[in-house]
Amino acid sequence: MTTRAPIHLGSGEPVLLLHPFLMSQTVWEAVAQQLADTGRYEVFAPTMAGHNGGPPAGTWLLSSSVLADHVERQLDELGWDTAHIVGNSLGGWVAYELERRGRARSVTGVAAAGGWTRWSPVKFEVIGKFIAGMPILLLTRLLGQRTLRLPLSRRLATLPLSGSPDGVSERQLSAIVDDAAHCPAYFQLLIKSLLLPGLLELAHTAVPAHVVLCEKDRVVPPRRFSRHFTEFLPEGAKVTTLDGVGHVPMFEAPGRVTEAIVEFLDQCTQPSRRAVNPPAS
């Protein structure tokens, strides 16, 4: 598996973007560019260990902790002690793990995974959804891009990702298939997740937190899966709902995702921005 260079753009406040399970940094391309174009953020979006283009995991099994270990090393190489961390799905789980280690200035979970305890039925429901997708995953490994020629392939590929089949472009769909076909983390992480709890220390989150819910999320539907975050995060955590989008909203609504991130980061950084640009007397 070839390792690719992470997305690294812009200058200003450090922002780390973490992608979902089975996918790669490519899901953040549009949002990363939009954040960098504000002129206020230095954006870093790596592909996590065991995923297409990421470093080898170095272990038989994967967990959010192991993934966070790899990301921490990358932050150290950048010279970033802390960053504003934004994660989607699995990336959201890893974002909270990094916050627990003191690496976050703020944390945003977009349709974040990990909102369960060890024996929560919702945990096994999510794992079951990924296991149910195993035949499609095996087809992508056998056929590669030819998978997209099969009947209903677009519908099946986009069902867990977007609010509608048209929410993902042909180029994005091709990248999704490539990512899924080259992701050893699939088995490594699912097996380990069966044995581990999710995010149990949300109440101790010590930085500003932002929960982004996706109305048409079919992987972690917000009506049932958001409660763990809204109940256990400290009072004052911001909650944003993106209407009409699925589990990976960066595909169908990158501008709205960027807007939600920037609005929250502006709230987090206002004092320092006022210090840099004091009002005219």
Q: Which stretches of residues belong to each language-model region?
A:
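Conserved loop-alpha-helix segment in the C-terminal half of the alpha/beta-hydrolase fold
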Residues: 203-245
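Flexible "cap/lid" loop of the alpha/beta hydrolase fold
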Residues: 104-140
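Conserved HGGG/HGGXW glycine-rich cap/lid loop of the alpha/beta-hydrolase fold
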Residues: 7-55
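Active-site loop/oxyanion-hole signature of alpha/beta-hydrolase fold enzymes
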Residues: 3, 9, 42-90, 120, ...
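Short glycine-enriched nucleophile-adjacent loop
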Residues: 92-102, 107
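Conserved alpha/beta-hydrolase catalytic His-Asp/Glu region
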Residues: 143-203
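Catalytic histidine-centered segment of alpha/beta-hydrolase-like enzymes
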Residues: 245-258
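Conserved alpha/beta-hydrolase "nucleophile elbow" surrounding the catalytic nucleophile
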Residues: 19-21, 83, 87-89, 214
